[in-house]
Amino acid sequence: MPVVTLAVDAMGGDHGLSVTVPAVAAMLSRHEHMHIILVGQLEPLTSALSQANIADHPRITVQPATEVVAMDDPVAVALRQKKDSSMRVAINMVKEGRAQAAVSAGNTGALMAVSRFVLKTLPGVDRPAICTAIPTANGHCHMLDLGANVDSEPAHLLQFALMGQAVVRAVDGVEHPRVALLNIGEEDIKGNEQIKEAAGLLREAQGLNYVGFVEGNGIFSGEADVVVCDGFVGNVSLKTMEGVAKMIGNMLRQEIKQSWLRKLCGLFALPVLIGLKKRMDPDHYNGASLVGLRGVVVKSHGGTSKEGFACALEVAQLEARRNVPSLISDALGQPGTH
């Protein structure tokens, strides 16, 4: 198996080095054919590597960067002022061919803007999108756009559908993914004109297994492998899912603590509860792809744990090995990036 190299923004996110370095250590122990370039401010980064006992790891390279994009930095600051940020340097490495993918837990808007500026979009892509896996009753689906584009034209939704199909084929091995449009109803008469026009485009697209509209509750029942929506709807949906999952976990804990009998029942049900938590845990599905770019870029949730960041690294290495940008180019009928 060939070695895949990931460029990691070690400083990004709410927790920075305390999450990224342990996650990298875990990934290197799982994957023999992986090299990590850790990008960040030299002194704190080398200190974190020493604390994790991986300072001399043969498959880790340290790339200095003098600046960090803060979670509340405006996009313009990240793009025009912080040109030596750990985020920017990591993405530059993909452009230069020194890495096959970049991973960051930093500011989403900044990451999309910098990635688009440095890597550019693939031929035929008007707007990149954010795509991630969502848990369902029988596995998971992929949903896009999750916030890159607040407003999207019908033609953009068609591009999202084609890109999502390419991602699912690559990472899940589903040859003919079921593609659906997220709508307020399943009937053809439901929805605004934008959605209705997009439905017509998806229905006529050759090679696209379009199965119609899906409602919000249909996302989780496994009715589709790819769920397409604009970034406003997608981001609200994603945050709602995360909030509901967190609420259910908190409610279960509160109910179990009500009495000793409930605590005893909770103890017997522990294996079931652990399995349920794993299936619903946002960290387990951490790692959103910025699709439509001339390179693989994966966004980790800013507040994720080391386990969650490791999941984002898994997504990046898989998409890099499958050369997802090239597959997206093929899906759009454009020359690929090989």
From Swiss-Prot:
Pathway(s) it belongs to: Lipid metabolism; phospholipid metabolism
EC number assigned by the record: 2.3.1.274
Domain of life: Bacteria
GO BP: fatty acid biosynthetic process; phospholipid biosynthetic process
Family of the protein in this entry: Belongs to the PlsX family.
Subunit composition and interactions: Homodimer. Probably interacts with PlsY.
Protein role: Catalyzes the reversible formation of acyl-phosphate (acyl-PO(4)) from acyl-[acyl-carrier-protein] (acyl-ACP). This enzyme utilizes acyl-ACP as fatty acyl donor, but not acyl-CoA.
Protein's name in the database: Phosphate acyltransferase
Predominant place of localization: cytoplasm
Coiled-coil segments: none
Enzyme class, spelled out: transferase
